């Protein structure tokens, strides 16, 4: 299969190559794509060196699959051009997520929505993916009435420049004397501000979690409210999640459901200090859940803590899993 990775030199693009290798995706011809300033750079894939090419050259090569992590602007411009030559596109930006003509997919949750007519498929927001993996099976069983989520998101979610800012600060750099991704210092700080603020007082990141939840679960009746914050960690995103169900639930059954759900690892043994932590989620594809307990302030409430590597399951791995579904359904060539 002829596969292009668009945005290949970025944090997520690099991880996409790794995940394609690790999962033995059937790539017979690899096309690394990036912006004009990166054309000619060398990348390694499956033990071979490749030169980065322009999007125009990649489109001319007519790939079977293109996995995008190049930002909303390039995706809006280029994804239709790739699709026009018969290429299936899986896009990691927010560009197509709420487009009513495009599917928004977490494979473990709603892979069944994909059809042969889908040529541009949207990869959800990283925080939404890790939240919905544990929520979806509970919603099927108990019907979720309301979700309150607070996120503690790794600097890696803001890209290489954000990581460089944190490393500079930890090295003793003085604020204002180095290129900064964030409007404030991030080291030894928490910034309750991810993406732009909207007129309703929420940020775009917070509203992504609201709107994407409704679309992926195909249920606009669920109440969702979110607060998202950036924290000075590398390993992954953490979320404090409070659920209110429409019917009474059994805590042991919740644990059983999660233990039987692919992609979820339960870490919940507080007697031995076992619970999910982002430092130990790094490099893994599962979503880790723990600190399960009833919310005694409401009749049918559940609290839990949820952690995931945002660059893997929150981005690269989920995108490759979507491609695997397309392959399994026969929408991509097997070789």
Per-region residue spans from a language model:
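Charged docking surfaces used in two-component/phosphorelay signaling
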Residues: 66, 155-335
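N-terminal Rossmann-like NAD(P) cofactor-binding subdomain of oxidoreductases
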Residues: 1-186, 221-223, 256, 287-288, ...
